[in-house]
């Protein structure tokens, strides 16, 4: 099994407080890794470091053999073809002036076929009629499914879910967990599933990393 992500000597501080301090973390292709810890322990900061939206002080983020930690926005656009992220608040991640279908079509860039957009929606359990709905017209669970469709549009090898189900009720949460698990297995994606809920992580992940005070204390 090949390594898809390797973090080495990662350090990030805000003022005098160390937010992330990780010696090493390796994620292999095809794994579903849970990252768990209490709120404020540094999980979302680490996700930002991996996606290069949060700049680290020192260390390296090796993704598919390249250190992307110093990449500029242009270079990161190429990386985002293989790496996507789903956020805690799906509605906030969509442009309210765009239909859900248009947002997904934008992710497709050069292949904005209406049929392909509809197929993506159907693949995440949404009927084609949702293509023409706006974020404010659908439930949180439906919007999160659309967010997953948008992430899948570029056929990523690596998917980060940052508290992607925490704002949903238990029933919808279970449906989204089952969907992510099914897609991870069928598409052979690598998933980093970030959550404060260890029981939830155990349902979907084959490996678990425990974070406390910015450090990985168990993996």
Regions found by a protein language model. Give the residues of each.
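The feature captures the beta-strand-to-loop junction immediately N-terminal to the Walker
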Residues: 36-38
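Conserved ABC transporter NBD signature motif
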Residues: 59-67, 79, 218
